[in-house]
Amino acid sequence: MGERDDGLGLSLSLGNSQQKEPSLRLNLMPLTTSSSSSSFQHMHNQNNNSHPQKIHNISWTHLFQSSGIKRTTAERNSDAGSFLRGFNVNRAQSSVAVVDLEEEAAVVSSPNSAVSSLSGNKRDLAVARGGDENEAERASCSRGGGSGGSDDEDGGNGDGSRKKLRLSKDQALVLEETFKEHSTLNPKQKLALAKQLNLRARQVEVWFQNRRARTKLKQTEVDCEYLKRCCDNLTEENRRLQKEVSELRALKLSPHLYMHMTPPTTLTMCPSCERVSSSAATVTAAPSTTTTPTVVGRPSPQRLTPWTAISLQQKSGR
């Protein structure tokens, strides 16, 4: 066994002194392609000089070995180069930077689209606010008879603070009496009543609107209660009729029970009615007994039998 250092790397050679065979060298250090090729040429020249008779047989072996050595050395060199150079961190960052630049270019190239999107968002917000304001106006109209009435009740300040109309007892009494006479007022009546009560015409109109709404609501509640009572009565009557129908069906299925049943209705009369009915019966019975004459001495007609008719015919023939 021998060791040799050519200056290109540490190499080990295994050989046998007795048998003159080509030695197998193991390269333990990463070598460059030029060093490996030079070492391979040196080894090949040495083997050719020492053993010229076995060139043909050994050439194939050296070719396979050289190809394997070249592959392994190339892989090692690539790994070593990557290790020495380090990891390329800027590769992914460059791709991300390219994507960011493309996005910025797209935004810069289409300013009209950005402006249109912003204007569309503002338009949507304006529409939503307008819808909310319309709903609030409808709610105020349904509660107090319209926004105009609320402004008039506030005193025309327009500050948005709603104040309930306060009426004195005399004003409320006059309004109630007028409402009993006329549930609706024409413009002349409205102005006259407002001047009489020291109110505005719009306030009088709103009061009448609210009073009509309350009256209608009360009337609806009364009608609902009446209909509810009618529905309860009809339900009870229907239940009773269903019970009678079921009883009649049971009687129809069992006819032998008719004899044992009591009459469905029994009539009772008061004593005075019984005396009147008994006296009327006696009065009608007395003339019938007096007016029937009895005939004495006249034989009652008798019915002839067929045998008597035959005997009479025989007697007349003799």
Curated annotation (Swiss-Prot):
SUPFAM superfamilies: Homeodomain-like. Residues 128-140 have a biased composition (Basic and acidic residues). GO terms for molecular function: DNA-binding transcription factor activity; DNA-binding transcription factor activity, RNA polymerase II-specific; sequence-specific DNA binding. The keyword Transmembrane helix does not apply. Induction: By transition from light to far-red light. Residues 1-23, 128-165 are annotated as: Disordered. It holds the Pfam family HD-ZIP_N. Residues 160-219 bind DNA. Residues 227-248 are annotated as: Leucine-zipper. Residues 8-17 have a biased composition (Low complexity). It is found in: Nucleus. GO terms for cellular component: nucleus; plasmodesma. CDD domains: homeodomain. Signal peptide: none annotated. Keywords: DNA-binding, Homeobox, Nucleus, Transcription, Transcription regulation. One of its GO terms (biological process) is response to hormone. Belongs to the HD-ZIP homeobox family. Class II subfamily. Probable transcription factor. This is Homeobox-leucine zipper protein ATHB-4. It comes from Arabidopsis thaliana (Mouse-ear cress). The lineage of its organism: Eukaryota, Viridiplantae, Streptophyta, Embryophyta, Tracheophyta.
